[in-house]
Amino acid sequence: METTLLFKTTLILTFELSIAFGLCIYFLKAAKKAALSGKDFFGIHFTQAVNMNNELDLIPDPTRSIEYPRKMSKLVDKPEYKWKNPKKKETEWSVVFAANREEAIAYLKDGYEDEMDMPKPLATTFSLWILSSFALLISSIVPPYEYYLLVGMFLFTFTNICLGPVLAWIMLMVDENDGIRALKITLIVTFLAGFIGYSDFYSFAQNEYLALVMFLLLLGLVVFSLVNLFRGFSRGVSRAVAIGGATLFSLYIIVDFNRLIYLEDLNINDWNTAFYMSYTIYLDIINLLLQILDAMSNS
């Protein structure tokens, strides 16, 4: 019996999200267990605190995981003889190495910054996630070939194995309790949006005007995020934009599930298409989760 495109897409999507979210929850639970026993986990030590809801809140404490000598740096003015333009002041990075904690504190007071914000095991995982995500993106948009599905699924799975710890780190930096709540909200919104999109009471995927508006809003969200890296907006503005971003990605989930009906009407029902659609919806869901986390962190 031939399965539907919806079944194939949902099967792949559920499998991959189970890996990412499952590992994320495992890392959060393991981090809590390690913190309660005074040990580190994945190269990270934690300080125990209590949030406003009287819940245990783990705060990553990278200073307890630092090895010496410790590289530190700060931006300083160049000597005048090094200026390329005699009339224009120039700067350069001054790098020092602290031999112990006392020296590191002294350098911090002098304006030097610690470059070791993320523990090495996590930094390695994050780098692998970036590389595999880029490779996955490329593999999903190239024309289908003999091993399209095999290569795509391998990269998809490896990417989510790396994403799990990264998501856990993001949640720990905010509040893992809010992170779990954001995860639950994401799953509920995804289910409702998928149901609305696949019920086909309106052809969202074929509305060109809606697609254009959503693309422009997405472009605006990207521009805002880039500007926010350098300028820094108020918490209220950031929260409002994050809520808008969550709404936008919820709409994308509706549109992409609605597109499945359109493809089925064209008698397109193969695993390559299911892989591509599952990856597209997956991106919507991950971005939805990140926007919800951003909104919670700025509340």
Give the residues covered by each predicted segment.
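A hydrophobic alpha-helical transmembrane-helix feature that marks the membrane cores
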Residues: M1-S299
